[in-house]
Amino acid sequence: MLKFLILLSAVACALGGTIPEGLLPQLDGRIVGGTATTISSFPWQISLQRSGSHSCGGSIYSARVIVTAAHCLQSVSASSLQIRAGSSYWSSGGVVAKVSSFKNHEGYNANTMVNDIAVLHLSSSLSFSSTIKAIGLASSNPANGAAASVSGWGTESSGSSSIPSQLRYVNVNIVSQSRCSSSSYGYGNQIKSSMICAFASGKDSCQGDSGGPLVSGGVLVGVVSWGYGCAAANYPGVYADVAALRSWVINNA
């Protein structure tokens, strides 16, 4: 179904059409136009895994709490989840910790993608090091155009069934909520108060791994959430706005 929605969005983009609200394809987790990197450059990044296979990204908030996207945790039990931290490779190295429980934002809506944020509680504490570090939550949004980065292990091309073994990243620029919902871009009123956008010219508009970090100024400003499957300048990637959702994370950590 997800691939159908992405294909539908690409067709609509090519035709200059508008996809009705409610057909909002989630990011399929790809770093297109990205660069291989090491975990020491993104030590807050984790791989969220279902039954041992990479599923989504996430960010270390504390030794026992991970921030990710609510849409990553649909129809899944905590017992099937684990995270790998401290490794540039999702399938080896670093440390693995089981997920004891998780909580989605109570206001998350799979149709509108509002409040697309969740916290994972680990069964054991992470030991911080040069490759395992917590990242702070943004208390305010960066300015429109501010430099940011997105990292993850997503597929490198649309439609690919394989993912890279090594962590990758792309540099992007923040598109403010007000600008992302303006006539400058194609989303209009689908951009809600719990969202922020980012875009990079010449790179896929669906950067990153679902649930993974959008970082600017050394703090977590966004969680990879959704975007239309069309790498056009008028459709930036859309992220859960961490500054807007900060108090929820703190209260549920």
Swiss-Prot record:
EC number: 3.4.21.4
Record field: catalytic activity: Preferential cleavage: Arg-|-Xaa, Lys-|-Xaa
Site location (Required for specificity): D204
Pfam families documented for this protein: Trypsin
Listed SUPFAM superfamilies: Trypsin-like serine proteases (SSF50494)
Compartments it resides in: Secreted, Extracellular space
Key word Signal present: yes
Domain Peptidase S1: 31-253
Keyword annotations from UniProtKB, A to Z: Disulfide bond, Hydrolase, Protease, Secreted, Serine protease, Signal, Zymogen
Enzyme class: hydrolase
Top-rank taxon: Eukaryota
Molecular function, one GO term: serine hydrolase activity
GO CC annotation: extracellular region
Keyword Ligase: no
Propeptide residues, chain positions: 23-30
Coiled coil: none
Family: Belongs to the peptidase S1 family.
Protein's recorded name: Trypsin beta
Species for this entry: Drosophila melanogaster (Fruit fly)
Protein's gene: betaTry
